[in-house]
Design a protein with these regions (language model features):
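N-terminal non-globular leader segments, chiefly Sec-dependent signal peptides
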Residues: 1-59, 63
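Short, compact, well-ordered microdomains
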Residues: 60-99
Length: 99
């Protein structure tokens, strides 16, 4: 079988310790509806971001989740589906689009 990669424009954000401050609007809206939750840990009395979890509410995927760690990317495709892509894979699969 022969396969061809589907090229499409996507929106992406990299998970960093300051994701709360740099998150785009679509990411913030998903956080407000609790589809995306920021994972935090308390270390030596300070709370730090360790990643985030994406929860699926559709009946077909009820109870499913994706976990992203610091450095991973959350990718939103043209249909609105979210996916987690590791940094090495993201650099290989996606190129920054010129504005």
């Amino acid at each position: 079988m022969i396969y061809k990669a589907i090229e499409q424009t996507v929106q992406a954000v990299q998970i960093t310790p300051d994701i709360d401050m740099i998150a785009p609007d679509w990411f913030t809206k998903k956080m407000n509806t609790e589809e995306i939750m920021i994972d935090r840990a308390q270390r030596d009395g300070a709370i730090s971001v360790i990643g985030c979890t994406i929860y699926f509410n559709a009946r077909r995927y009820k109870g499913s989740r994706l976990v992203a760690r610091i450095g991973d990317y959350i990718v939103k495709d043209s249909v609105g589906r979210l996916n987690v892509v590791r940094k090495n894979d993201f650099d290989r699969l996606y190129k920054k689009e010129e504005a």
